[in-house]
Amino acid sequence: MPLFHYVGGWEIDQKLIIVSLLLSAVTSYGSGIEHRKKGYVDDGLIRRALYGAIPGAMIGVTFVMITGTDFKSIFKILSVVVVGFVIFKMVRKVIYQQSNLTAGKEAQLGKMTLLSCFGGFLSSVMAIGAGMIYVPAMKFFGNLEARKSIGSSLNIMMVVIPFAVVAHFLILDNNQVENLFDESVLLLVLVLTNFLGSKFGAVIGFSMFSEDFLIKLFIAVLSITWINYLFDILF
């Protein structure tokens, strides 16, 4: 969403949410399938997380409908808070090199499901895959190692995001639907490039990049996004 809004000049509305969610879904499929091939998933925890994530996504769609014209401001404030919190937690992990040993610990399924519900909500409201929520939920409450946390998170998104896309599409007005179809060629190109990029990116990541490097790269990307939202609110 930030790329379309700040670079492409698109307005933050339900049309942009649908496009951003569509690309997030395609990315999750491209990378999620590769993680599944390697066995980096836990289907039991994925099913449990979906009990929270799918209702959360529906609640998020309802929230967007209710807030109406106030949605843009609420979106940016919520983005600053949530993305800022995620950056803070990840930076702490890098600085202190915290080792979260999961062996022998019992999964906290209630907390994992609740956090997954929040992830589904953010998917609909912030137009993101919500991996920033699902991965910690899988790792810290599901007690999965890093690769399985990422793979399970992607497989959750493969199910949740299509629900949010359909729900948002059903409440578009006629003008937004026409505008969306006018961009069909661009969307097709973006879908193909995102799918191939995420697929090959996952394969390369398995063999070439350490978890520490990927975390630092993710922090850098999130920080740029956070600064954009903050400046937009303040100025």
Predicted region positions:
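Transmembrane helix-bundle signature of multi-pass membrane transporters/permeases
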Residues: 17-25, 50, 54, 153-161, ...
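Interfacial segments of multi-pass membrane proteins
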Residues: 1-15, 133-148
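Hydrophobic alpha-helical transmembrane segments
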Residues: 1, 19-32, 63, 99-104, ...
